[in-house]
């Protein structure tokens, strides 16, 4: 550990007992590998293999026109460099993509009108631009329109053939109806199924079913062939009055005789009636020499004839294949002298008559009728002809354009049906269909097993590359139609490939996929862990997948094959449970899309270090031991019986039968679950909540790695890209808050610059508005190796994930303030900013060109006081660093308001005399309610050709200065390195020539060289040719590097000065970023890592909190009743171990202080070696040891890996070493009375997270605001600045109190009575406090809805009704 840079700063004590052999793969490999394989940007030697983008082009091209006189071929594709880099795309709100250029070849043929022979007339090649292809960033994300998105991998049913039954649900008798389904990667599905009468049917694409024999007829078989394919035949030969039937021991074993079995030759009884023929007896009968048995006419009746019985002379058909033999038929056959009758071997026990019965009910008996039937099912209403029917049937399953099993489908099919087709055979064959029907019939006969569709051998993962490939193929196919039409309509001799191609459909398909596909998601960027988990997510939803509503329990359930592949713990709560999963830590996806997990080989009971990755199908054959199986020093399995897994069962076997062993105990859980210490002591439901809530932890102002971790923290920080790792080994040259400059020392490849500049992100906004800020960990002069962490990012500390803070917890009730999971906090936590986080809100405003004239961003706003403009600069944009509150102006903007459009003359007069104020309204960007903060960044975007204002120019100048500084620093290091190398070459030489004033043959020393300016050193010439070429090469390389540097700088400046690409109609856009500091307050949600969540109920003054004997106050008080029923005891063990860690930290701190006083490192070394193993400390100098010790003052960090961590005894040992009570409990004193509590209390350090559910984002108030247009009721929700709904139950409450007038107000003038609202306003203005409520608008809406149902409802007010009564004529009144 001590050999890494961070390891020299802080060491984690490791409790794991099991050595891990396999290297954990990079956590975002799933994304990166998949997309790289799809794009294949760098063309390998010998051209690209046929996969990814290459295969898409290969499958669509060549395209020929309808008359086949021209052919458009695909040659190759290349990517150009992307126009903007990742950061520029993020800032400008555009997509990070590279232009795709495709080389196409157009071949025009001459067709001889007489012979039809073709000859090449013309060949044209050209590069065609085919739109931009989004590129993946280093961290496995895509930048689409300036936001980071992730493409989630999809789990779907693997192509291939599946056998299943309906579990007895279809038929009332509960009979199992078997079915087979052939699922291609794309194309028509074919189902073959039994019905309740045991007839076999086929259906194509879930359409109407047809007898399976019709399908077989369509494949070109006839009835006799069908029967001979599915059944064996037995020939009965006439033997006097009886028949002889050949004796077959295999066929008859297990047969129960109803009559005596008699040997046809000798006449002896070989088996008496009522007895069962065992396998042994059957064998003995054959050994005795029995060749045939005797059979009577009765035995033949009821059997089925195996082939057509025909009189070849007359052509008369006596019986057809499949006919049942009746006594009459048998007599008829005997009469015409037939001596041998071949029958089908159907015994109704081992072999059923299903296919024969299907053949009997099938109306068709030849190919033509069957094809017509299939055509009518697929295209009802169209009259079939033989040609169209044949073509349609061929295109369904045998046309590679329409039907693709994919390599996976073919491999799975071969495995399931024991076929041997090559995996390039992607369509179905006749043999495949026959094999499927045969396997289905065997299932019905009780042979074989049905498939488990939730087995991971039958589900595969489609990652980014493959999803993108399918999408692009769709785009190209749309394009293909257009190309064909264009080829036919233009003069083909004169056009170039460019003219035939419109790349819009392809580009649109890509855009649509990244912009609106269900699997393209807005990246969860709350903290580094949530980024990593989002990229490792597997979703069963999405196009071609399941839907939430239809997914049953089985699909969602944990399956034995998930072990080491999919995490059984991490999945969302709610409707998506089990449909969205997470990849396990060591899992990877193989080329076929199946998830593999690593194992160690075990040979003869000895565990080796050889690691193999196996998919679920391959694993089923082996006995797999657990990683925790006991071994001796020679790695021999020591127990007599080892617990193993095999094919989903857990069994015990002898050590020498074990084949494999898990590589690590944490290989079965996901990254988030592997971050929970003592996971093995938590209930699974709570662990699920714990994994999910860690992803919602907000990065705090001061990160603090957990005292009790699991050792995964560093891995997550590194792979998430939050912490910066050194790209090459080198020496730190410069460090400040915004960048780190490293002078590279490893292989200085002449083409690469000898310096790496790492820009640190400062106060950037994440997708979730949390704050991304990085800070350096290194000092000038430190040596770093490749991969060392040189800067911390959000939620990382010393290169380890740090999602929360270690706080001193006491488990005890406190005045009911921690009832029902509430959390009581000490004021110290607020005062010391323990749980303070920074959130960055982004506000943007656009100045558009309206019909009435352009909007303008300005400081000159009508009717606004100077006070309100105090934070704006002369361009009308807020200053950086200004503190703003709700309602403050961020960007001043005025919009022309038109009574009427102006004539050109009026426009001219306006322009000359500038009468503005009268006809503009204030549409400034203001701070929304509930936001208070500091402006941290302002970005101004101008359209091409629009003059930049002062603010935009100032921002541009700053940016150019920064770029120039980078260039100058890189140049300085380049100079220093190059001239140092040149000096090394020249010193000790006696040049024959040199700069002006140099005497020939003078011996060069460093002093002599120092007399000449460095730029003149190149003029020295030495005799040695080899040395001269070296100097020349050095100079050439130096000049090129210099030129490259300057060019890069100029490119960036040119990009800055160029206008921005804004949406149509927008002249100018300003983005303002406000940083909001959120301290913790009552109502915020907090959680530990064990699913122990709660809401802060009260923040208590420090002096009132319970305190320990040494006067230390607890930071947080949790309710002990939250533990037993939830069964997440991990939090208690974590508290104890954290308590020990803090105690050891105090001891180390004392030793460090003693060392600093008297410079004797021995006591410090002894203290440290009590805690750590010697190997962890070797190679540390005294000064480094003191630095490590200094970083342990607050507590010694420990790692207790999941299923392999500290046991109770280890915790007690640590507590003892720290000089604390072994029980982990302490006497606490009441902060208010100073008296000790009656019983000891569990006190220790627990790691708490502040979650993204902050009360500030939820609290909301409104007096007057927007109303809905239709119902005129106030809108709802904080985002719309809506009101609170006064619902049914609230109405009951007011009714119960009899508060009639309050209720009337609520339902009318405070809600949707439009006239009443204005009256109230007028009354308030007049100072009057009486008003009248009218009819609520929603009542009118209800009336309109009733009218739309055809009920004519009229409203008659009660006064009017009374008047009508009075005015009624007297006779009507009578």
From Swiss-Prot:
Q: What are the GO MF terms of this UniProt record?
A: DNA binding; DNA-directed RNA polymerase activity; ribonucleoside binding
Return the SUPFAM superfamilies for the record: beta and beta-prime subunits of DNA dependent RNA-polymerase (SSF64484)
UniProt catalytic activity = RNA(n) + a ribonucleoside 5'-triphosphate = RNA(n+1) + diphosphate
What keywords is this UniProt entry annotated with? DNA-directed RNA polymerase, Nucleotidyltransferase, Transcription, Transferase
Origin: domain of life: Bacteria
Kindly give the Pfam families that the UniProt entry links to this protein.
RNA_pol_Rpb2_1, RNA_pol_Rpb2_2, RNA_pol_Rpb2_3, RNA_pol_Rpb2_45, RNA_pol_Rpb2_6, RNA_pol_Rpb2_7
Protein purpose: DNA-dependent RNA polymerase catalyzes the transcription of DNA into RNA using the four ribonucleoside triphosphates as substrates.
Q: Which PROSITE patterns match?
A: RNA_POL_BETA
**What name goes with this protein?**
DNA-directed RNA polymerase subunit beta
* UniProt family annotation: Belongs to the RNA polymerase beta chain family.
Query: Coiled coil located at which positions?
Result: none
Q: Which GO terms describe its cellular component?
A: DNA-directed RNA polymerase complex
Recorded hits in Gene3D superfamilies, A to Z, give: 2.40.50.100, 2.40.50.150, 3.90.1100.10, DNA-directed RNA polymerase, beta subunit, external 1 domain, DNA-directed RNA polymerase, subunit 2, domain 6, RNA polymerase alpha subunit dimerisation domain, RNA polymerase Rpb2, domain 2
Return the EC number: 2.7.7.6
What GO terms in the biological process aspect are recorded for it? DNA-templated transcription
- InterPro entries reported in the protein's UniProt record: DNA-dir_RNA_pol_bsu_ext_1_sf (IPR042107), DNA-dir_RNA_pol_bsu_external_1 (IPR019462), DNA-dir_RNA_pol_su2 (IPR015712), DNA-dir_RNAP_su2_dom (IPR007120), DNA-dir_RNAP_su2_hyb_sf (IPR037033), RNA_pol_bsu_bac (IPR010243), RNA_pol_bsu_CS (IPR007121), RNA_pol_bsu_protrusion (IPR007644)
Q: How does it assemble?
A: The RNAP catalytic core consists of 2 alpha, 1 beta, 1 beta' and 1 omega subunit. When a sigma factor is associated with the core the holoenzyme is formed, which can initiate transcription.
């Amino acid at each position: 550990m001590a050999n890494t840079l961070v390891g020299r700063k802080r060491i984690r004590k490791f409790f794991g007992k099991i050595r891990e052999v396999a290297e954990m793969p990079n956590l975002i490999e799933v994304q990166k590998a998949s997309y790289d394989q799809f794009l294949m940007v760098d063309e390998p030697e010998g051209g690209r293999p046929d996969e990814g983008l290459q295969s898409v082009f290969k499958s669509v091209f060549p395209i020929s026109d309808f008359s086949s006189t021209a052919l458009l071929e695909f040659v190759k594709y290349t990517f150009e460099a992307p126009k903007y880099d990742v950061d520029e795309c993020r800032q400008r709100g555009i997509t990070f993509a590279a232009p795709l250029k495709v080389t196409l070849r157009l071949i025009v043929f001459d067709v001889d009108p007489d012979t039809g022979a073709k000859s090449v007339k013309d060949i044209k090649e050209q590069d065609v631009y085919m739109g931009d292809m989004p590129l993946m960033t280093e961290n496995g994300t895509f930048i689409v329109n300036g936001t980071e998105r992730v493409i989630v991998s999809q789990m779907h049913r693997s192509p291939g053939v599946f056998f299943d039954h309906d579990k007895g649900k279809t038929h009332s008798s509960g009979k199992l109806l078997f079915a087979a389904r052939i699922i291609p990667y794309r194309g028509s599905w074919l189902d073959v199924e039994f019905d309740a009468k045991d007839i076999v049917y086929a259906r194509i694409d879930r359409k109407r079913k047809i007898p399976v024999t019709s399908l077989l007829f369509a494949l070109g078989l006839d009835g006799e062939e069908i029967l001979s394919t599915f059944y064996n035949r037995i020939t009965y030969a006439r033997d006097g009055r009886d028949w002889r039937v050949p004796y077959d021991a295999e066929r008859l074993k297990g047969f129960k005789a109803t009559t005596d079995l008699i040997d046809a030759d000798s006449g002896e009884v070989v088996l008496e009636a009522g007895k069962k023929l065992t396998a042994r007896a059957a064998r003995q009968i054959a050994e005795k020499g029995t060749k045939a048995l005797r059979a009577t006419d009765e035995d033949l009746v009821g059997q089925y004839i195996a082939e057509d019985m025909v009189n070849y002379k007359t052509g008369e058909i006596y019986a057809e294949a499949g006919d049942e033999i009746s006594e009459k038929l048998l007599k008829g056959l005997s009469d015409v002298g037939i001596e041998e009758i071949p029958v089908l071997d159907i015994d109704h026990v081992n072999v059923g008559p299903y296919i024969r019965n299907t053949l009997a009910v099938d109306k068709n008996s030849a190919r033509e009728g069957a094809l017509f039937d299939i055509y009518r099912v697929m295209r009802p209403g169209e009259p079939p002809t033989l040609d169209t029917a044949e073509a349609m049937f061929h295109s369904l399953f045998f046309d590679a354009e329409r039907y693709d099993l994919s390599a996976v489908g073919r491999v799975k099919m071969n495995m399931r049906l024991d076929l041997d087709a090559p995996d390039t055979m992607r369509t179905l064959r006749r043999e495949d269909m026959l094999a499927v029907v045969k396997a289905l019939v065997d299932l019905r006969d009780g042979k074989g097993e049905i498939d488990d569709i939730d087995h991971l051998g039958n589900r595969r993962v489609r990652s980014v590359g493959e999803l993108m490939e399918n999408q692009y193929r769709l785009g190209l196919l749309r394009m293909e139609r257009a190309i064909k039409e264009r080829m036919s309509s233009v003069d083909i001799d004169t056009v170039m490939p460019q003219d035939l191609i419109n790349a819009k459909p392809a580009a649109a398909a890509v855009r649509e996929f990244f912009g609106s596909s269900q699997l393209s998601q807005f990246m969860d960027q709350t903290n580094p862990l949530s980024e990593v988990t989002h990229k490792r997510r597997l979703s069963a939803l999405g196009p071609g997948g399941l839907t939430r509503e239809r997914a049953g329990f089985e699909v969602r359930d944990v399956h034995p094959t998930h072990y080491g592949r999919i995490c059984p713990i991490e999945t969302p709560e709610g409707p998506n449970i089990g449909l969205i999963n997470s990849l396990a830590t060591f899992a990877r996806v193989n080329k076929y899309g199946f998830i593999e997990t690593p194992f160690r080989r075990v040979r003869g009971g000895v565990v080796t270090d050889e690691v193999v990755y196996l998919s679920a199908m391959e694993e089923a054959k082996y006995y797999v031991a657990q990683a925790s199986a006991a071994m001796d020093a020679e790695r021999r399995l020591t127990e007599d019986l080892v617990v193993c897994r095999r094919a989903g069962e857990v069994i015990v076997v002898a050590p020498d039968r074990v084949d494999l062993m898990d590589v690590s105990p944490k290989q079965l859980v996901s990254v988030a679950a592997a971050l929970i210490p003592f996971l093995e002591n938590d209930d699974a439901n709570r662990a699920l909540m714990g994994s999910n809530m860690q992803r919602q932890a907000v990065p705090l102002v001061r990160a603090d790695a957990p005292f009790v971790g699991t050792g995964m923290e560093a891995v997550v920080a590194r792979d998430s890209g939050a912490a910066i790792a050194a790209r090459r080994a080198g020496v730190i040259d410069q460090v400040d808050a915004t960048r780190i400059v490293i002078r590279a020392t490893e292989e200085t490849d002449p083409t690469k610059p000898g310096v790496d500049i790492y820009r640190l992100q400062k106060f950037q906004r994440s997708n979730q508005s949390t704050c991304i800020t990085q800070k350096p960990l290194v000092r000038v002069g430190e040596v770093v190796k490749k991969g060392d962490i040189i800067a911390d990012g959000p939620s990382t500390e010393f290169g380890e994930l740090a999602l929360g803070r270690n706080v001193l917890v006491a488990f005890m009730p406190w005045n009911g303030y921690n009832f029902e999971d509430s959390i009581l906090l000490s004021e110290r936590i607020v005062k010391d900013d323990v749980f303070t986080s920074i959130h960055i809100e982004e506000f943007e405003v656009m100045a558009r060109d309206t019909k009435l004239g352009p909007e303008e961003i300005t400081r000159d706003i009508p009717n606004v006081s100077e006070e309100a403009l105090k934070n704006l600069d002369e361009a009308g944009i807020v200053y950086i660093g200004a503190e703003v509150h709700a309602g403050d102006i961020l960007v001043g903007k005025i919009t022309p308001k038109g009574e009427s459009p102006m004539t050109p003359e009026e426009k001219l007069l306006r322009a000359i005399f500038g009468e503005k104020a009268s006809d503009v309204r204030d549409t400034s960007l203001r701070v929304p309610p509930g936001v208070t903060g500091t402006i941290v960044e302002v970005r101004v975007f101008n359209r091409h050709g629009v003059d930049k204002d002062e603010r935009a120019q100032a921002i541009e100048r700053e940016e150019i200065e920064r770029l120039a500084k980078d260039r100058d620093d890189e140049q300085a290091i380049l100079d220093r390195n190059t001239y140092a190398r040149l000096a090394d070459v020249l010193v000790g030489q006696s040049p024959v020539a040199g700069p002006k004033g140099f005497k020939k043959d003078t011996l060069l020393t460093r002093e002599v060289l120092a007399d000449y300016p460095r730029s003149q050193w190149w003029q020295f010439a030495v005799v040695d040719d080899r040395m001269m070429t070296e100097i020349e090469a050095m100079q050439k390389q130096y000049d090129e590097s210099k030129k490259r540097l300057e060019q890069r700088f100029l490119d960036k400046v040119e990009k800055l000065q160029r206008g921005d690409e804004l949406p149509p109609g927008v002249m100018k856009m300003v983005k303002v970023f406000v940083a909001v500091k959120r301290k913790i307050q009552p109502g915020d949600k907090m959680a530990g890592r064990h699913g122990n969540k709660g809401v802060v109920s009260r923040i208590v003054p420090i002096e009132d909190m319970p305190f320990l004997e040494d006067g230390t106050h607890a930071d947080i008080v949790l309710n002990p009743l939250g533990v037993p029923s939830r069964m997440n005891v991990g939090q208690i063990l974590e508290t104890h171990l954290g308590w020990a860690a803090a105690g050891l930290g105090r001891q180390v701190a004392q030793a460090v202080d003693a060392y600093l006083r008297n410079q004797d490192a021995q006591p410090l070394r002894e203290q440290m070696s009590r805690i750590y193993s010697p190997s962890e400390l070797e190679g540390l100098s005294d000064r480094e040891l003191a630095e490590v010790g200094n970083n342990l003052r607050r507590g010694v960090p420990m790692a207790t890996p999941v299923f392999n961590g500290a046991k109770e005894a280890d915790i007690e040992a640590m507590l003892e070493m720290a000089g604390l009570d072994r029980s982990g409990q302490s006497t606490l004193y009441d902060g208010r009375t100073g008296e000790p509590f009656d019983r000891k209390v569990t006190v220790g350090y627990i790691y708490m997270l502040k979650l993204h559910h902050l009360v500030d984002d939820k609290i909301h108030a409104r007096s007057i605001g927007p109303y809905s247009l239709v119902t005129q009721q106030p809108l709802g929700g904080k985002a719309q600045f809506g009101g609170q709904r006064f619902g049914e139950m609230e109405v009951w409450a007011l009714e119960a109190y009899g508060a009639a007038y309050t209720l009337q107000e609520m339902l009318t003038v405070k809600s949707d009575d439009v006239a009443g609202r204005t009256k109230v306003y007028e009354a308030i203005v007049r100072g009057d406090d009486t008003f009248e409520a009218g009819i609520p608008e929603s009542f009118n809406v209800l009336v309109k809805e009733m009218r739309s149902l055809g009920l004519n409802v009229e409203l008659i007010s009660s006064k009017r009704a009374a008047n009508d009564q009075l005015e009624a004529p007297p006779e009507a009144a009578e």
